[in-house]
Amino acid sequence: MSWQAYVDDHLMCDIEGHEGHRLTAAAIVGHDGSVWAQSATFPQFKPEEMNGIMTDFNEPGHMAPTGLHLGGAKYMVIQGEAGAVIRGKKGSGGITIKKTGQALVFGIYEEPVTPGQCNMVVERLGDYLDEQGL
């Protein structure tokens, strides 16, 4: 399966039990900041934004004072899982980032998708990639 198929079929799909509800944007990005696959709606990000995200995975809490920045948007960092999952909130939407052995899985959502639904979609694929050694 291509990386783009993972984004299209596992991240940008309808939320289970909620036909028509899906993430606004999603991507799989290597730890080095290279995009493996992304939805057409995923924001263009700056290298320093990706560096900040990687630093927060290695030093949990690094982004708490300044927020998580992606594609010029600022998210307030909320409770995640140290070294494994970063979650952010912005208005009625937010972001979930799951770190795997080689990649970062991004999901961005707006209402009516809930934070819990975004977490489920992103973390399910992230856990699968981890199990595959990716």
From Swiss-Prot:
Keyword Phosphoprotein: yes
Disulfide bonds: C13-C118
Signal peptide, first to last residue: none
Position of sequence motif Involved in PIP2 interaction: 84-100
Major location (coarse): cytoplasm
UniProt entry tagged with the keyword Disulfide bond: yes
Subcellular location: Cytoplasm, Cytoskeleton
Modification after translation (UniProt): Phosphorylated by MAP kinases.
GO cellular component labels: cell cortex; cytoskeleton
PROSITE patterns listed in its UniProt record: PROFILIN
UniProt cross-references to Pfam families, sorted A to Z: Profilin (PF00235)
Gene3D superfamilies per UniProt: Dynein light chain 2a, cytoplasmic
Residues modified as Phosphothreonine: T114
Keyword annotations: Actin-binding, Allergen, Cytoplasm, Cytoskeleton, Disulfide bond, Phosphoprotein
PANTHER family in UniProt: PROFILIN (PTHR11604), PROFILIN-5 (PTHR11604:SF25)
Note: The variability of the residues taking part of IgE-binding epitopes might be responsible of the difference in cross-reactivity among olive pollen cultivars, and between distantly related pollen species, leading to a variable range of allergy reactions among atopic patients.
Family membership noted in the UniProt record: Belongs to the profilin family.
Protein name: Profilin-3
